[in-house]
From Swiss-Prot:
Keywords: Aminoacyl-tRNA synthetase, ATP-binding, Cytoplasm, Ligase, Nucleotide-binding, Protein biosynthesis. It comes from Helicobacter pylori (strain J99 / ATCC 700824). This is Aspartate--tRNA(Asp/Asn) ligase. It is found in: Cytoplasm. It is an enzyme of class 6 (ligase). Aspartyl-tRNA synthetase with relaxed tRNA specificity since it is able to aspartylate not only its cognate tRNA(Asp) but also tRNA(Asn). Reaction proceeds in two steps: L-aspartate is first activated by ATP to form Asp-AMP and then transferred to the acceptor end of tRNA(Asp/Asn). Belongs to the class-II aminoacyl-tRNA synthetase family. Type 1 subfamily.
Length: 579
């Protein structure tokens, strides 16, 4: 039906008969001469038709998004009529034949216009996908999937599919449940990850497994979350953390070659505690400096009892400083107020600061600091004339969080972030357990191998876990797994899962661990998030063919939707109004 894709045509084809096919991107009638920009997956080429052509009458019928097959001779555009914005901007096709394969209603959205309301774009996603940018995104997504398969296959990994219909084993988020018609009153769950099945594959001697897996989590959505998503999932036997990290680094190096980036190995490693204390995040963005600096001891003799009391509780409280170089000349009073309102959203009671000026130190904190305390702060933060030093004080968790967010906000405001840089990082030595209102739970998941399970302080027990971070975004992570039944039971006990509950939820795993499970570990990389970063897309929805909204609905198909009474009866389900 066609001899060329649109952008395959070049000056060397001048004089040749060309046949192309695609959609009408734009249509113009200039004094009887018709110009059509034809679009296919590769890009645009201009078709031109004057009244002497036998295709002229057909050309007059063409409108936006009509499906066309065109035949004609390639020629150079006239002097001064070239379009440097197009790859084919020096040539055009003089129409000899034109077939309208299909007509189109007036499109409700402008193809490729990102300023169109996103809900409207999602409702007409099949039109939104016609944009050249969308095609490039999904072309790269396909290439990365192929690179992943080839790279892992070369390392001896087998691609094995694990079940989609499984048992509910909550891993932090809520499960999506599927009622069983055959087993009345019982439910399958869609997998939040293939975690337990891939461990069972290691017990089964598969040695190295991977899949590009679909996962499902019924959780509150954010800009980078979807209820169904894809991850590169892998597991390997007889390995340690270095082995797994090496596989991930090799894989990411191959993947980023696809967009022309050379990645240096090994990646930097940073302990979790260092990441939190110095950057206020377990996924720090290291494309810029601005570390958080501990200055609690500088407030020991503060005349402000709030600060001095915080300083005397270094286990649960923090006073952190953030020196922003040159900020005094840039941050007006209104900007400082905006920054204060920003951190208040995350639990701050205010935002104290010192302005380092030619005529001395200004700011609300000066009067509360001793001469020695002020001197130590200036030295420790390397504060110079023109700088502003911000302070956060209070509960450790809250302070680290909002000061970490302030660090990012300031970097964005001052344009300190190199948008083209790729800064990979491993965060390691995670805590095994985290405290909640209902006791402790596993920080990653309860199948992670602890390092020092006998430690009396549960908060000091570390996990054999690791996260890979790119530019402040968690790409993925993994851990070395528990491969002995006794250790798995100990971990369950720590998170208040008694033996009866453990058997009910995870009995099949505990049974498998009795039969000589090998040491094993693995990782998962968020595939959608990876493509979002590689394409510099604004939203994860841009890199998923048919995504859900932030309310977990599909505007295209109007899902979820009600089902009829007959379907409910077959599933032994009766609905009642929420109380």
């Amino acid at each position: 039906m066609r001899s060329h894709f649109c952008t395959e045509i070049s000056e060397k084809d001048v004089g040749k008969t060309i046949k192309v096919a695609g959609w009408c991107n734009t249509y113009r009638d200039h004094g009887g001469v018709v110009f059509i920009d034809l679009r296919d997956k590769s890009g645009l080429v201009q078709l031109v038709c004057d009244p002497s052509s036998k295709a002229y009458e057909k050309a007059l019928e063409v409108r936006s998004e009509f499906v066309l097959v065109a035949k004609g001779k390639a020629r150079l555009r006239g002097a001064g009529l070239e379009n440097p914005k197009l790859k084919t901007g020096k040539i055009e096709i003089v129409l000899e034949e034109l077939v309208i394969e299909n007509k189109s209603a007036t499109p409700p959205i402008e193809i490729g216009n990102k300023s169109v309301n996103e809900d409207l774009r999602l409702k007409y996603r099949y039109l939104d996908l016609r944009s050249l940018n969308a095609y490039e995104i999904f072309k790269l997504r396909s290439e990365v999937a192929l690179i992943t398969r080839n790279a892992l296959a070369q390392k001896g990994f087998l691609e094995i599919e694990t079940p989609i219909l499984s048992k509910t084993t909550p891993e932090g988020a809520r499960d999506y449940l599927v009622p069983s018609r055959v087993h009345e009153g019982e439910f399958f769950a869609l997998p939040q990850s293939p975690q337990l099945f891939k461990q069972l594959l290691m017990v089964g001697g598969m040695d190295r497994y991977f899949q590009i897996a679909r996962c499902f989590r019924d959780e509150d959505l954010r800009a980078d979350r979807q209820p169904e998503f894809t991850q590169i999932d892998a597991e390997m036997s007889f390995c340690d953390e270095d082995d797994v990290m090496g596989v991930v680094e090799d894989l990411l190096q191959e993947i980023f070659k696809a967009i022309g980036h050379t990645i240096s190995k090994p990646f930097k490693r940073m302990p979790y505690k260092e990441a939190m204390e110095n950057y206020g995040s377990d996924k720090p963005d290291l494309r810029f400096e601005l570390p958080l600096i501990e200055v609690g001891d500088c407030f020991m003799d503060s005349s402000n009892s709030i600060f001095s009391n915080i300083a005397q509780d270094p286990k649960d409280k923090r006073i952190k400083a953030l020196n922003v170089k040159g900020a005094d000349a840039v941050f007006s009073r209104s900007v400082l107020k905006e920054l204060e309102e920003f951190v208040r959203q995350f639990g701050a009671k205010g935002l104290a600061y010192l302005q380092i000026k030619e005529d001395g130190i200004k700011g609300p904190l000066v009067k509360f600091l001793s001469e020695k305390g002020l001197k130590n702060i200036l030295e420790r933060t390397d504060a110079q004339v023109g700088d502003i030093v911000f302070f956060g004080a209070g509960d450790k968790k809250i302070v680290l969080d909002y000061m970490g967010r302030l660090r990012l906000k300031v970097a964005e405001t001052l344009d300190l972030i190199d948008k083209d840089a790729l800064n990979f990082l491993w965060v390691v030595h995670f805590p095994m357990f985290e405290k909640t209102e209902n006791g402790y739970h596993a920080a990653h998941h309860p199948f992670t191998m602890p390092k020092n399970i006998e430690c009396e302080d549960i908060e000091e027990i570390e996990a054999h876990a690791y996260d890979v971070v790119l530019n402040g975004v968690e790409l993925g992570g993994g851990s070395i797994r528990i491969h002995k039944e006794e250790m798995q039971k100990k971990v369950f006990e720590k998170i208040n899962i008694n033996e009866e509950e453990a058997q009910k939820k995870f009995g099949f795993l505990l049974e498998a661990l009795k039969f000589g499970a090998p040491p094993h570990g693995g990782f998962a990389i968020g595939f959608d998030r990876l493509i979002m970063l590689m394409t510099k897309s604004n939203s994860i929805r841009d890199v998923i063919a048919f995504p859900k909204t932030q309310k977990a609905s599909c505007l295209l198909t109007d899902a979820p939707s009600p089902i009829n009474e007959e379907q409910l009866r077959e599933l032994h389900i009766r609905l009642r109004k929420p109380i």
